Amino acid sequence: MAYSYFEKKRIRKDFGKSVQVMEYPFLLSIQLDSFRKFIDTDPTGETGLEAAFRSIFPIKAYSGSSELQYVSYRLGEPLFDVKECQIRGVTYSAPLRVKLRLVVYDKEAAAGTVKDIKEQEVYMGEIPLMTDNGTFVINGTERVIVSQLHRSPGVFFDHDKGKTHSSGKVLYNARVIPYRGSWLDFEFDPKDNLFVRIDRRRKLPASIILRALEYSTEEILAMFYDTTDYTIKGDKLIMDLIPERLRGETAIFDISIKKGEVLVESGRRITARHIRALSKAKLEKLEVPADYIVGRVLSKAYIDKSTGEVIAEANAIITLELLAELSQAGHKVLSTLYMNEFDVGSYMSDTLRVDSSTNKLEALVEVYRMMRPGEPPTKDAAEGLFSNLFFASERYDLSTVGRMKFNRRVGNADDVGTGILSKEDIISVMKTLIGIRDGKGEVDDIDHLGNRRIRSVGEMAENQFRVGLVRVERAVRERLSLGDLDAIMPQDLINAKPISAAVKEFFGSSQLSQFMDQNNPLSEVTHKRRISALGPGGLTRERAGFEVRDVHPTHYGRVCPIETPEGPNIGLINSLSCYARTNDFGFLETPYRKVIDGLVTDEIDYLSAIEEGNFVIAQANAERNDSNKLVQDLVNCRHRNEFILKASAEVQYMDVSPQQIISVAASLIPFLEHDDANRALMGSNMQRQAVPTLRVDKPLVGTGMEKVVAVDSGVTAVAKRGGVVSYVDASRIVVKVNENEMHAGEAGIDIYNLTKYTRSNQNTCINQRPVCRMGEPVVRGDVLADGPSTDMGELALGQNMRIAFMPWNGYNFEDSMLLSERVAIEDRFTTIHIQELTCIARDTKLGSEEITADIPNVGESALSKLDEAGVVYIGAEVNGGDILVGKVTPKGETQLTPEEKLLRAIFGEKAADVKDSSLRVPNSVKGTIIDVQIFTRDGVEKDARAVEIEQMQLKEVKKDLGDELSILEDGIYARTKKLLLSAGLNESDLTSMSRDKWLTQNLADEGQQAELEQIAEQFDNIKEDFDKKFEVKRRKITQGDDLQPGVLKIVKVYLAVKRHIQPGDKMAGRHGNKGVISNVVPVEDMPYDQFGVPVDIVLNPLGVPSRMNIGQILETHLGMACRGIGEKINRMLEAQQEIHKLRNFIQEVYNVGESRQVVDVASFSDDEVLRLAGNLRAGLPIATPAFDGAAEKEIKELFVLADMPQSGQFVLTDGRTGREFERPVTVGYMYMLKLNHLVDDKMHARSTGSYSLVTQQPLGGKAQFGGQRFGEMEVWALEAYGAAYTLQEMLTVKSDDVNGRTKMYKNLVDGDHRMEPGIPESFNVLLKEIRSLGINIELDKD
């Protein structure tokens, strides 16, 4: 492959064997595409805002005299950009303006005659916008809307697994789930009657629904049963014979084919052989005894023709008496229902007998009573309720997905249809359910991903927006009906508040709108690709069973089987697989390569879980020859969710990649195939907790996925267009764009402003550093600047550490780690944490608070770090308790003593009226002030510091725009010069005059003069545009801020804290091998090898075998080989060997193994080879993709190239004694992460502090500055030791004896170390509780 200039700087050697047929899809597309569908105008009106508007509008008045129609909508421009919103603490959103048309009809004229039409654009609130990185900025904080995996609308058939009834009988049920509306359930009871429930209420016989749909008993029976006719001849019955229907019956008489030839004797069971013989004999009639018809059911009602009296109702059971009666009434043919024990049950027939209703009205009344118990039913109310349940599009919608699923399940040919149910739909559900009960068909697997779909941001926002619109609709309808429409405009009808409230509620406080996990780029990407089964309309932790949480065969390639949280949410929160995407219906799809007659093509099809089951799919590692044909006769395949062996000619599809089944986080684990799944799960989860280190270090052993994550996460600055870097400093990069990528009349310059030392949601540091230099060429997609945890455009979550697996004085007992002091000194795991501290000046009843440096009773030293406005300087180093922002609050006037009044009169001292309420640094925090932001209310005078900050921001904006303008000017003057030279002016004339006079020259040629004037006009327009741009920015910066009521000023101070690695910090590898640092040992005491190189970390070898994460050992060996190769290249560079030797060695390294990667070092220039070698000095970075990684043989080859022992084990010497250890030790390089569980955040001690109000016991937890609970078991321990006084102290003065503890505090101050324990407050609480039971206990204080 061809590498760009930037990519040639450092090439990661790839051990992957299988050819990559497709790039990884953009990792955030699930979020961005969904939201784009929501806000883009959809001409079909099926999705997004358009669909919401069309579903509610037009809104008609109750009288029909007017209606409000929807025309179109547009989203305005957001007021502030993303960064400004984050700084100001506001929502990044755009105003929604909707064009509405009010149509008033003429009451007097014919129906539909329009009297008046008014059209107007109406403001309908703000719609939060998604940033380019798939997040939302809500009230200044970045949030992510997690996609939800919910049960797809449609119809589902299931059974209770025999758990409902004591007999263990399996009871089948069907459930019609709409996208919105009432649920309709059908279920069998233990007696095999069919019942219906609406919205899980009381059950009714299922026939009631059919009666309510105007079906009679006869029609119902005709729909569900075939009939068998019997002709009465005297005292004999002749049956119309269909041989198939006799299967399984026991003959109660001899069945003969011909005279004397008995086929089935009486008492024998009729088998398939008998039926074949009957069919062969073509017997159409069979004489049966009268007993044979007894117990059968009539399919229709029979009437006595002479009297008109009903002899037998439809569904009546035939008895001998009834038979005689019917025969007597002259009925010669009786039609009975065909039923048998095996495949046609008597369920509907039995249900009709249970049903008390006989006509439509009775059925509707029953439904009404069930839905609205206690309300008296009327005919209209009952009919209205029933038709609104399933047959009104306003109340009920299956959605396109639901209709497609419904039709496919009940066997309808079409995939499309209406969103409401029809009579036929309800009948087909009942027929399918009865079929399943009869053994025809299977129940559904609700955990199959064909029955669960993804609801993403756009869809959820649309639903919420529709909820807001429905609230508005009611108000509009009432307003329209009030009359006086002549003076009313659409604006007067619409109140945007309910819409804004619904949208705000969803984005601000929905369970699926989550505070973004911003620890590092991986945690951001993973959070956006998360799929939750929880949330509104989903499952709850308590109700979810094992099946829902389990890995399902359909997860393959769609949902990661590894990455899920440990704990109560296991299996309910999942992560999208690398290549998965959602289709138009919201079902997850995964890509497959098409295979035709054993030949693997490059054609790629995306299949959903529903479609996949029908195909035979081979795995990505199936052996193929050079012509891409499958080699083996039998190939390992998946078919109908089972793993089987199939002939290569039968294979229809093949996986696109071995990494297809896992998520992004799991695909970052090298040698994943050698790790136990539980540990891989921990590894995936812990990578998300890694804190970005101060000095980034790319992993030596990676998987090739690092680059994809770093670029797609959006933390790096990526070139939008190709060009040449014309300017670089720490905070901005300017790229002069290639001419072929420029648009007509534009600047041809891209400015990238980098994010510097910004606080993330998790208080970690977001900082971008340029990786390009001036004059370097860039192509589109190149990384220009690294973000947090990225190194030259690759994800770098931790550091490559030299580790040894050996015990060391018990310091690595039970997963502890021993660390070398060198790691701390070199700042390898030093991290920066930024805290935001806020000081708010409010308007109080006693007067307004003031931010000032004039604080009462505070010494000069405490104010030394504040400026004259009372705000701390940037760059000041502060400790716990230091004042950051001086603030005074007025306090209520106290009654003064005469002496104080006199002093006040003499000295005029007023300072006593205010109290110090300054913002101070929290205890145990020490850091540097890196930024201050001041927000002042409109109309409040700005202080000197606020003005200074404003000036600085304006200067930056000016510089940006000035750079862009100067480059544009240069381009325009270059074009002008070319034109003037071609018009005959010479170069010396042009250089002697100022450039702005070039544009005012008079040229002889009219065409050239016109062109010059056009250039001059273009130049004036550009200047004007820039002035406008600057004015807009200036207004934004200088305008007052929109603060909450009562707030005058807000000062935000950003404090950077450096955290060095220390004992108690948690660290981990990528294989779930986590541990806590037990000790940091001087470097001279660490074990070292024969070259005197000490190890950085000593790990316990016993942590490996039982955990079965062998991947870490392979990573250690491979890391060592990579490091060895880097050292060899370093030696060659230092010895200044010939370039061809260096080139050959590097080529030899890249040629190791049978990988898909081709690196032609021969085609590199000498400078490029030297640059590459310089970047390989620290070690050769390699990629070993999951399930497709480096083999043992290849690792050994690298060891040989690096001149190292192939065992990967080395003889180490003890740094303390100087003696060699007995056995060689596994030493190598492992990528270690420092997790965001730092001892500084956990360590906490309390002497005195706040107490709980009722029990008066100290609070718990660091956040509340609480104490350590001395619990029940600790009390037992002291009791066991007989330490009575210690126990008394613990239970009284150190806990909730209020008087005792106050007295002890006084005594300690006085130097008196005695205590006087009293009655603990909890004892008083106990007394009060006993009194509440009516038992009085009094204490005698003798």
From Swiss-Prot:
Keywords: DNA-directed RNA polymerase, Nucleotidyltransferase, Transcription, Transferase. One of its GO terms (cellular component) is DNA-directed RNA polymerase complex. It is an enzyme of class 2 (transferase). GO terms for molecular function: DNA binding; DNA-directed RNA polymerase activity; ribonucleoside binding. NCBIfam families: PRK00405.1, rpoB. DNA-dependent RNA polymerase catalyzes the transcription of DNA into RNA using the four ribonucleoside triphosphates as substrates. This is DNA-directed RNA polymerase subunit beta. It comes from Colwellia psychrerythraea (strain 34H / ATCC BAA-681).
